[in-house]
């Protein structure tokens, strides 16, 4: 979908030709004598329209308005969250139709236009319009081709617009790779996606194969991949936005491209959803896509340990002991607790980079789903400042997380008679004990763990990846920029140039 940011008064909006005009109506709408303001005032007065977020009123062929269809949508207090709810409702109504190719989203009625509200509106448009088509033989063409975002002025809107377009591209890439079936998203293919990102401004990609991984001593990662014929890959992405001497923020994404559970095999029901076990990796790819678009001034490294967890004839067995890259030995009591095994070696690798902070992202535990459901991701950290930064980013990006405990007492269950540590500690507090396991490998740097098992995808009729937590990660990274000297801007090719315009109208595609 193409997005265009355009300065339009309410009067000019009435003259804008479009298949649909979406108008967000907040509490305390200011009066006006243009056709749009009159229509909204009459609808509210008659009781046909509520300003509660998401409430809709459709009108067709309104006198004085050039658009074929007008959707008045309640936006409540006009907060970013209310704006998102309103736009989701409007886009849902448009998606049900067949003839909308060009739409105008009017934000002029909002009392104070915050950049965050503009971002929320555009991301909601992009996410609602997204449809997975990669493995369909006859994919339906997207109906909606252009969305004009109408504002009173660019001063407050431009920053939110630029950020939203970059974020939308990142979320879409994360969704695309997470939604792909496992045979279309193998570790090798995932590495190929990372190499494509390496063609974008400031991004470099390195892919390590089995021999290089073995040479590094990543025994835990190698152990997980023993049961599959698909070769494992260790993917390293580097975004270079600051001086080389500046320590990077490291993002680690769990990349289990399909998880059967191994010898500790999962139940057959809903096992197809285990293609989503690489959503952590997908979120790292998506975040790097957004970084390439926005070009912030900091250094970021992405690490993706990618492999399958299969019950082949060489698969690890319950009771096996393996040696991790750190030198610590691990007793594998449950082969379905494989995510922490690939992550622990990635954490040890991250220490070599002398990072300013490390954040790992993983669909790690069903226990986190039980604790937090699908609303908030679980946040664990050994550093207060890092945890606070991530929590703030979650709130500001509408991609929230919740801080979970890391008391040392939780580690008692990880003790082993046969190794330095066991990979599981029983059912009680499973999300916390998994994080305690990872913490053993993050003693030398500020570290946080995001358990996205409940937020990375949806089941049922709406089955599919959510693209979370790309929004959280991007806001977190942008918040780190002020402390880092920026490198000189990199000129992008026309296909990848960030959408930053000083003219009254800016066009871009997400």
Curated annotation (Swiss-Prot):
Cofactor notes: Binds 2 manganese ions per subunit.
Gene: pepA
Binding site for Mn(2+) 1: 259, 336, 338
NCBIfam families: PRK00913.1-4 (NF002074)
A GO biological process held by the record: proteolysis
Active site: residue positions: 266, 340
Signal peptide: none
Cofactor(s) this protein cannot do without: Mn(2+)
Amino-acid positions noted as binding Mn(2+) 2 in the UniProt annotation, renumbered to this chain: 254, 259, 277, 338
Principal place of residence: cytoplasm
Compartments where found: Cytoplasm
EC number(s) per entry: 3.4.11.1, 3.4.11.10
Entries under InterPro entries matching the protein: Leucine_aapep/pepB, Macro_dom-like, Peptidase_M17_C, Peptidase_M17_leu_NH2_pept, Peptidase_M17_N
Name the UniProt record assigns to this protein: Probable cytosol aminopeptidase
HAMAP family (alphabetical): Cytosol_peptidase_M17
Residue segments, region Disordered: 487-510
């Amino acid at each position: 979908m193409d997005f265009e940011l355009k300065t339009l008064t309410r009067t000019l909006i009435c003259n804008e030709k479009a298949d649909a005009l979406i108008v967000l109506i907040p509490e305390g709408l200011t009066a006006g004598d243009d056709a749009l303001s009159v229509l909204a005032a009459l609808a509210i007065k008659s009781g046909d329209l509520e300003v509660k977020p998401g409430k809709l009123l459709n009108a067709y062929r309104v006198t004085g308005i050039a658009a074929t269809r007008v959707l008045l949508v309640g936006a409540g207090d006009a907060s970013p969250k209310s704006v998102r709810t309103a736009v989701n409702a409007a886009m849902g109504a448009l998606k049900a139709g067949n003839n909308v190719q060009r739409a105008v989203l009017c934000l002029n009625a909002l009392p104070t236009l915050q950049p965050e509200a503009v971002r929320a509106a555009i991301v909601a448009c992009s996410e609602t319009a997204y449809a997975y088509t990669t493995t369909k033989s006859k994919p339906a063409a997207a109906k909606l081709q252009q969305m004009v975002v109408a504002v009173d002025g660019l001063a407050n809107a431009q920053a939110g617009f630029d950020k939203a377009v970059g974020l939308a591209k990142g979320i879409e890439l994360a969704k695309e790779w997470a939604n792909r079936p496992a045979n279309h998203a193998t570790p090798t293919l995932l590495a190929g996606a990372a190499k494509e990102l390496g063609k974008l401004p400031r991004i470099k990609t390195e892919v390590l194969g089995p021999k290089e991984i073995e040479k590094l001593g990543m025994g835990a990662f190698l152990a997980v991949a023993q049961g599959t014929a698909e070769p494992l890959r260790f993917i390293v992405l580097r975004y270079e936005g600051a001086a080389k001497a500046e320590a990077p923020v490291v993002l680690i994404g769990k990349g289990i491209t399909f998880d059967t559970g191994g010898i500790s095999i999962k139940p057959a029901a809903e096992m197809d959803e285990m293609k989503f076990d690489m959503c952590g990796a997908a979120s790292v790819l998506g975040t790097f896509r957004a970084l390439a678009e926005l070009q912030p001034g900091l250094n970021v490294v992405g690490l993706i340990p990618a492999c399958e967890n299969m019950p082949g004839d060489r698969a690890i067995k319950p009771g096996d002991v393996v040696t991790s890259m750190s030198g610590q030995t691990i007793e594998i009591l449950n082969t379905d607790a494989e995510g922490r095994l690939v992550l622990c070696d990635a954490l040890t690798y991250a220490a070599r980079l002398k990072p300013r902070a490390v954040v790992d992202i993983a669909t790690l535990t069903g226990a986190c789903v039980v604790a937090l459901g699908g609303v908030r991701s679980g946040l664990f950290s050994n550093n207060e400042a890092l945890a606070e930064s991530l929590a703030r980013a979650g709130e500001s990006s509408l991609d929230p997380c919740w801080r979970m405990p890391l008391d040392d007492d939780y580690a008692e269950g990880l003790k082993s008679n046969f190794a330095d540590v066991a990979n599981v500690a029983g059912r009680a507090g499973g999300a916390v004990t998994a994080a305690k396991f990872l913490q053993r490998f993050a003693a030398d740097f500020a570290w946080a763990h995001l358990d996205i098992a409940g937020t990375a995808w949806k089941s049922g009729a709406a089955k599919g990846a959510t693209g979370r937590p790309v929004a959280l990660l991007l806001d977190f990274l942008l918040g780190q920029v002020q402390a880092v000297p920026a490198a000189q801007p990199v000129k992008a090719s026309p296909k990848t140039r960030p959408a930053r315009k000083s003219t009254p109208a800016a066009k871009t595609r997400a």
